[in-house]
Amino acid sequence: MRGWRWLAPAVVVLLAVTAWPVGRAVWTSLFTDPLPGSADRAFVGTDNYTAIVSSRTWWEAVATTLVIVVLMVAVQLAIGLAFAAALRRVGRPWPIAQLLLLLPFGLLAIVSAVVWRDAVTTGFAAQWFGLDDVGPFGALVAVCLGEVWRGTGITTLILLAGLHRVSPSLLASAVADGATSWQRMRRVVLPAAAPALAVATVYRALDAFRILEGPILVDDPGATVRTAPFLVWDTTFSSLELGLGAAMSIVLLLLAAVLAAVLVQLLRVRRIV
């Protein structure tokens, strides 16, 4: 109960900021597409939600989003853990290393997507690997790599904070007992850094679940990689189906909540959080 007292101010602010837009989206989702105040606007109840549940396009977009989430989180955790271990071994990270790690994440998502698009279409990556026409799979890989490039830095810093929780005396005892590097990592380092791993996993998974900029810019736009957030954007702003787009945004919000709950439960089962 004491922990909730510390969380209460942040929860109140979060609810105050999100209550109006979420409520407005729910209200909009109950009507047909014309703009509010239009004479052609009609109440349709849950028809938009029924259309989403029965839409193959929607569930294909959700599946694509989940594939991206799994790939991005796995790669970011692996690279981030390797970088964090290297920085911990060096000692105090160099300022230039911190800058290079956080620079992609510090950019606006749309800016980093533009940088990555130029790299894989007309820049160094296109010249090195001959990326003239990468196809659907190549577009998916390009989108994933762009997000990995943007998010690995913050993942590294989260994991580095977790690695600093490892007691040097405990590592020295493991070395004295003859433990190998892999045994020390598995038996000593990872259990101590487990809370940081949990935070990084949930944070990066939810961030990956809202991926939009990559499919719009790298894939020109959404030609082969159609994620659920992209479908919401395309339905709302390109097709101007406001009611259906609002319903999609609510369903996407619920799916993100389910994803977070599942991840937290899995981490609790493994006694990580």
Residue ranges and their predicted role:
Residues 3-273:
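A structural signal for multi-pass alpha-helical bundles of membrane permease subunits
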